Amino acid sequence: MKGLLSVAALSLAVSEVSAHYIFQQLSTGSTKHGVFQYIRQNTNYNSPVTDLSSNDLRCNEGGASGANTQTVTVRAGDSFTFHLDTPVYHQGPVSVYLSKAPGSASSYDGSGTWFKIKDWGPTFPGGQWTLAGSYTAQLPSCITDGEYLLRIQSLGIHNPYPAGTPQFYISCAQIKVTGGGSVNPSGVAIPGAFKATDPGYTANIYSNFNSYTVPGPSVFSCGSNGGGSSPVEPQPQPTTTLVTSTRAPVATQPAGCAVAKWGQCGGNGWTGCTTCAAGSTCNTQNAYYHQCV
């Protein structure tokens, strides 16, 4: 009996950890660094932040300080890659932000301003999202030297507002920029950059989804002044075949499986586990997505 209970407890723990995803590793140059070596470790496992007024929107729950996190040196203009524990599977945009620390990145809480340097939005026609296990972007070459928080977020809008609540999956890396220029981009405060009335926050990806505006400011580039986010409009149909990837159907789970809180437990086409772990229930958010809450 004790053995069976241990197996059940382990199964539930694995389910909890795999319910969502987290950006946990950074690559710079040709080196893939250790898990949470240069990324602040959060305290909510891989669960999302949903409160638009929370300071946790900056660097996730438990990410206000980086005292136990190292800071990596990178050159302005160089590329970097964020890696996840499991590929992003909630539809929605992925964005990267920078915020310059007044001193060391490790002691900075992100209360200054943030500017966006990259968006991965949907492509049209079809509304296909970039659902990947890693995301590579480039630092602007013109920004000033110093220490920064490098923030990545995946905004899950798979559970349309207002029946559901969009989910922010966030991580912050600590970097020291060298070889830069003289530009200090203007930015936005977080929280405050995202509002419940933003079209990209309230979008319903299951109904008349033909264009999309990524929440937050526009992407900064050297020589630009920034501004509001630009909408992603439908593009002419390509003459070549566009190969896209979708999440593979989830295999039917064995009897006794349990979905962790915030995980998917049903919906049209869902073939996975439909039983929620103790303490949560399966709630119908829409025809396509049922969630343990």
Swiss-Prot record:
Lytic polysaccharide monooxygenase (LPMO) that depolymerizes crystalline and amorphous polysaccharides via the oxidation of scissile alpha- or beta-(1-4)-glycosidic bonds, yielding only C1 oxidation products. Catalysis by LPMOs requires the reduction of the active-site copper from Cu(II) to Cu(I) by a reducing agent and H(2)O(2) or O(2) as a cosubstrate. Improves the progression of lytic enzymes in delignified miscanthus cell walls. This boosting effect dependents on the cellular type which indicates contrasted recalcitrance levels in plant tissues. GO terms for biological process: cellulose catabolic process. It comes from Podospora anserina (strain S / ATCC MYA-4624 / DSM 980 / FGSC 10383). Disulfide bonds join C59-C172. SUPFAM superfamilies: Cellulose-binding domain (SSF57180). The gene is LPMO9E. PANTHER family: GLYCOSYLHYDROLASE FAMILY 61-7 PROTEIN (PTHR33353:SF11), PUTATIVE (AFU_ORTHOLOGUE AFUA_1G12560)-RELATED (PTHR33353). Cu(2+) binds at H20, H90, Y169. One of its GO terms (cellular component) is extracellular region. Belongs to the polysaccharide monooxygenase AA9 family. This is AA9 family lytic polysaccharide monooxygenase E.
